[in-house]
From Swiss-Prot:
The gene is xlnR. It comes from the Eukaryota. Residues 19-30 have a biased composition (Polar residues). This is Xylanolytic transcriptional activator xlnR. GO terms for cellular component: nucleus. Residues 127-153 bind DNA. Its main location: nucleus. Residues 1-30, 46-121, 178-213, 322-349, 576-597 are annotated as: Disordered. It holds the Pfam family Zn_clus. The lineage of its organism: Eukaryota, Fungi, Dikarya, Ascomycota, Pezizomycotina. InterPro entries: Transcription_factor_dom_fun, XlnR/Xlr1, Zn2-C6_fun-type_DNA-bd_sf, Zn2Cys6_DnaBD. SMART domains: Fungal_trans, GAL4. GO terms for molecular function: DNA binding; DNA-binding transcription factor activity, RNA polymerase II-specific; zinc ion binding. One of its GO terms (biological process) is DNA-templated transcription. Residues 8-18, 56-93, 178-188 have a biased composition (Low complexity).
Amino acid sequence: MSTTSLQPFAPSFSPFPSTQSLGMAPSQTIGLDTLAEGSQYSLEQLQLSREAGNDAATATSSTSLRSSSFSKSTDQSVSNPSGNHHSNNGPPSDFKSSQRDPLAEARSAIRKNSTSAPVRRRISRACDQCNQLRTKCDGQHPCAHCIEFGLTCEYARERKKRGKASKKDLAAAAAAAAAAGSTSSSTANDGGPMLTKGHSPSDGRSSHEINGRYDPAFDAARTLTNSAQSQLQSHADVPGMVGMQNSQQPHSQPPLGAALDALHLNHFSALNESNRPQMSVPDLRTLQMLHPSGTNPRSPSAVLPSQGLNSYNETAYSLMNPQESNPASMNHFRLGSSAENQPPSFLGLSPPAQSPGWLPLPSPSPANFPSFSMNPYPSTLRYPVLQPVLPHIASIIPQSLACDLLDVYFTSFSPSHLSPLSPYVVAYIFRKQSFLHPTKPRVCSPGLLASMLWVAAQTSDAAFLTSPPSARGRVCQKLLELTIGLLRPLIHGPAPGETSPNYAANMVINGVALGGFGVSMDQLGAQSTATGAVDDVATYVHLATVVSASEYKAASIRWWTAAWSLARELKLGRELPPNTNTARQDGDRDADSDVDMSKRNLPSLVTSVGHGSGTPLNVTEEEREERRRLWWLLYATDRHLALCYNQPLRLLDKECEGLLQPMNDDLWQAGDFGAVGYRQVGPPIECSGHSMFGYFLPLMTILGGIVDLQQAKEHPRFGIAFRNSSEWEHQVLELTRQLETYGQSLKEFESRYTSSLALGAADNETIVDGGHLDHVSPSGRSSSTVGSRINESIVHTKMVVAYGTHIMHVLHILLAGKWDPINLLEDQDLWISSESFITAMGHAVGAADAAADILEYDPDLSFMPFFFGIYLLQGSFLLLLAADKLQGDASPSVVRACETIVRAHEACVVTLNTEYQTFRKVMRSALAQVRGRMPEDFGEQQQRRREVLALYRWTGDGSGLAL
């Protein structure tokens, strides 16, 4: 065999086998194909091999004759390139011919002796998705599994066979490598040209014929210029080459490990025809996206070239060494120096800097990474904003499902006004269009994106999450672990590549080492930090919200505390100070072309944001509004959880007295910042809109005052003196006035959106504006007439008024009555006979009437399930007290109110099931007593009732709902 047929530039080289279609992605999952064979198949092969070994002893002469005849036919087939060859990727022909007949006879004997039903034939190959998910595949294209779950069905991974390579092929490859090295070195010493006979077109064709795997699609790889040849020569002429030539003899037969050591990793030669696994280019590209050098890991990674790997050009292989100054040399094999052969940092999949070692992140699988697919298979990534998190979720969920989950996150409850459909999205902090922009999305941290997918996966109805039933729990658990790992809790310093030169010196401040907590002097003096830090606060909010709605409410305080603390450090409660516009450099103008179109004409303000004091940075009005909405959301949840968990307030009114109130949600999603008009500052106390910031935030402002009053009253030393002073009465009157102001604004809000005058001009307002409906939900455009949209708006308005009225009455009860249910039932101070009890009882009946309206407009209580439970519970305690004390003498209004509360609790359990809502059992037993049905074990039921209520205490040391 001529040595010129095995050249380093063999045109038959392909990053994936030539038997594949060029339209498939050259991705593979190394090490998983050997697990695809079942145990039954392995036992059958073992039995066949044993019988073949027994038969081979009695058929030696015939086998040798067949072997010689088969070798002759093989030589003839080499001279005939049009023949079909299948021995290049398998073991030597002598081995196959020696066991062909015994194997065939053994198979026929097994089939004759089998009395069972016909054995189902195994498919030759499973698709990439089924292979990765370890599911059954029918071998079709597309297969039934991918069609059912809407996955991309591909057969792109490399075909691999078992066993080690043939010694003959390894020896020939080593000899060819040594001959090629000696030829290259002699040519370089003579100063002659690089081209030799081995690179002539005729020899190139003969090499294809001998290899038996000629593919004309890769002819472009043979057209090398003289400059490229000289670059190859410079890379090939290195000291390591001589050692390799001297150590390997042409006719020796080294073992497999020695042969692989002799050939460099990037030496693409006829060794690709053997059975050793090849380096997968998509694997390297995926790992490169995990640890990009010189880029911000919080920004979207650059998408890899869209063109396919039709030839191994410099673009496709430049990612293998991003520091290479001459990427064109990557077209050829390269025997680098010792400095170049250092193992890259990303090959070990070590966690990124500053990340905790307690969370093993799953390595991304390239099988589901659509950026590497060829041109005939377009990418399924509808939303480029997901690019930073794609390498991390590739082994968890498909790309199409990730896009669907992002849609679920931004889906609205109502087509007329914005209201999140997911019970775990309490308010919209970000603009939907900024996230779902097809070309210029918002730059997001991977942790925020992972948390959004995790929140949406809690309630999504996608088939991938519902079949089998355990799929949702498994996927949500993986997304949760990924979110925590990407968030790096309590570590919010600069990411790798963003650190300043004096960052290490700033890690020790006044003798205190702060490096473990990601604190630097630059950040302590800044007005804010980069957008990634704001994303971290939003990620904490997502984690805390879902945990708060579960049975682990006490654990949610950790996440809420982290969110409140980081928000205070970032000074989200303050407006960023405006500054004079500074002259922009040419580079800034060029960078402006990459900004979202909705942000270009916005008034930009210059401030120092996480880059040291005095560093100018343009902050758009959208980014300012994100900061405001994030603060006001944390402000509202702080007061809500202070009631739930019987805790003092964390965020004070003083911290945000100069902060603008959130803008209208419809205008916010439309990006119409110029139409906002006059805006008030400080905490609001009047209803102003349909969103959580419009009707619920004012109630939480008033609740904060009630919580402060309650904490002062329960103070162990000063509480008694405060309750008996005139200051107590003054504070109660002020809070009562604020509640009355809110009630009046609620009536004005209802009349403004439901009166005939408002309906006459509705065509020009946001409730029927099609442009705004595009930002609400896909179903917003389903209403065909203006009348139906107006009706939806009226229903939504009445539902908001019902919820606001109910919570307002509950706040009246909290202000005038007792919070703890056991103290209510014991009634040691005879509060039940006071005037304040009669006032509070009237508000309890009013709250029950509002609950009846809520059940009429929102039967399943899905409008605000995260917030509503505690107010329903606190509004029920007085009714329970009346039913327990009065029993059969209760008024019809009290009985009707108790029935309404029981219905509301049952509906609330269906929507958002939590343990404390078993209070409905207590209410049912009390309602039975009111109707005259006295059980025989009346004393036991009363004792059991108090045991249930004793779990949730609002006394001095009680923890409320946090068990």
